[in-house]
Curated annotation (Swiss-Prot):
Cellular compartment(s): Cytoplasm; Nucleus
Keywords noted in UniProt: Cytoplasm, Initiation factor, Nucleus, Protein biosynthesis, Repeat, WD repeat
GO cellular component: cytoplasm; cytoplasmic stress granule; cytosol; eukaryotic 43S preinitiation complex; eukaryotic 48S preinitiation complex; eukaryotic translation initiation factor 3 complex; eukaryotic translation initiation factor 3 complex, eIF3e; eukaryotic translation initiation factor 3 complex, eIF3m
Gene: sum1
Listed Gene3D superfamilies: YVTN repeat-like/Quinoprotein amine dehydrogenase (2.130.10.10)
Complex formation: Component of the eukaryotic translation initiation factor 3 (eIF-3) complex. The eIF-3 complex appears to include tif32/eif3a, SPAC25G10.08/eif3b, tif33/eif3c, SPBC4C3.07/eif3f, tif35/eif3g and sum1/eif3i. This set of common subunits may also associate exclusively with either moe1/eif3d and int6/eif3e, or with SPAC821.05/eif3h and SPAC1751.03/eif3m. The eIF-3 complex may also include SPAC3A12.13c/eif3j.
Per-repeat ranges for WD: 8-49, 50-89, 145-184, 189-228, 286-327
GO biological process terms on file: cytoplasmic translational initiation; formation of cytoplasmic translation initiation complex
Source organism phylogeny: Eukaryota, Fungi, Dikarya, Ascomycota, Taphrinomycotina
Family assignment from sequence similarity: Belongs to the eIF-3 subunit I family.
Molecular-function GO term, any one: translation initiation factor activity
Keyword Protein biosynthesis: yes
Biological function: Component of the eukaryotic translation initiation factor 3 (eIF-3) complex, which is involved in protein synthesis of a specialized repertoire of mRNAs and, together with other initiation factors, stimulates binding of mRNA and methionyl-tRNAi to the 40S ribosome. The eIF-3 complex specifically targets and initiates translation of a subset of mRNAs involved in cell proliferation.
Protein name: Eukaryotic translation initiation factor 3 subunit I
Length: 328
């Protein structure tokens, strides 16, 4: 499984995303640009320039016509995927740490940082119809996270619920229509930050990764933890694979401690676990810093990882992966 290595950023990666068809890969980093690549050969298609701070997050709509991004310059921006033109800009008092389109691409959520006396929020907007659509600047609702600072968020199937992961290890559920708080649950160890939240393709359950070295699969309707994946290192990212019942986890020793460690001791591998049996199946090496973000190809043919080292590594699963059968 030889990867394609994409070198298009000068700073650590923050998030990578495939589009709905899987033919494009978008990468965000702390160097103020978003790159888009052909996922099958690693050719760079273009760059989205305009942000003036580290870019934390991006998302693409189903038709791959619009891309939304959030950054440390306290803005969320909407882009034309094809031309790279900035179509719309929303301004906030603090940095935008996570953005996501809902399932029918009519709304966007933005998670903002708790900073300088401002409370952390999850703000939901309508997707603008045109560049001159001034009404889209007004939020549909604003959730002020009462539990602790929200770090990640996402929409469930049919935009029924909105889930948030928090700095204290809890996960909260909100009514996605009204923004009303439904319930909160301490899923991870208290005081351990939830670093990622990704849904299974049908959005009926999702996986969280956490600094407490575990990842947990949670059912949308029952709000119960259905699976727990134990590792020996703080996790930054986790994702399900749509073909084969696996989860891929990424993390490693904290970036600030990395200079004192060999790559093997830093535990910078991507880890594959059996999604149902919770057993580790294997690891993929390559990055020489913590893995910050993992995205799985929508058709399950491969995955990409972005690291603190500034590289994106695109992997394609070989025949052995698809033939693999776990024996008890």
């Amino acid at each position: 499984m030889r990867p394609i290595i994409l070198q298009g950023h000068e700073r650590p990666l923050t998030q990578i995303k495939y589009n709905h068809d899987g033919d494009l890969l978008f990468s965000c980093a702390k160097d103020k640009v978003i790159n888009v690549w052909f996922s099958h050969n690693g050719e760079r298609l273009g760059t989205y320039e305009g942000h003036t701070g580290a870019i934390w997050t991006c998302d693409i709509n189903k038709s791959s016509t619009l891309m939304v991004s959030g950054a440390a310059d306290n803005t969320m921006r909407l882009w034309d995927v094809k031309t790279g033109k900035q179509l719309y800009k929303w301004e906030f008092p603090t940095a935008v740490k996570r953005v996501e389109f809902n399932e029918d691409d009519t709304r966007i959520l933005a998670v903002t940082e708790e900073r300088m006396g401002y409370a952390g929020t999850v703000t939901v907007f309508r997707v603008p119809i045109s560049e001159s659509d001034a009404a889209a600047e007004t939020p549909l609702y604003v959730i002020t996270t009462r539990e602790s600072k929200a770090t990640v968020a996402g929409w469930s199937y049919l935009s029924k619920f909105l889930f948030t992961g928090h700095e204290d290890g809890s996960v909260s559920r909100y009514d996605a229509i009204t923004g009303e708080f439904v319930e909160s649950k301490q899923v991870h160890n208290s005081g351990s930050t939830i670093t990622d939240l990704q849904f299974y393709p049908d959005r009926t359950y999702f996986i969280t990764s956490c600094k407490d070295t575990t990842a947990k699969a949670i059912d949308v309707d029952s709000f119960e933890v259905i699976k727990t994946y134990l590792t020996d290192t703080p996790l930054n990212t986790s994702s399900f694979t749509p073909v084969q019942d696996f989860v891929i986890l990424g993390g490693g020793q904290e970036a600030r401690d990395v200079t004192t460690t060999a790559a093997r001791q830093g535990k910078f591998e991507a880890r594959f676990y059996h999604a149902i049996l919770e057993e580790e199946l294997g690891r993929v090496k390559g990055h020489f810093g913590p893995i910050n973000t993992i995205a799985v190809h929508p058709k399950g043919t491969g995955y990409a990882s972005g690291g603190e080292d500034g590289y994106v590594r695109v992997h394609f699963f070989d025949k052995n992966y698809f033939d693999f059968k776990y024996t008890l």
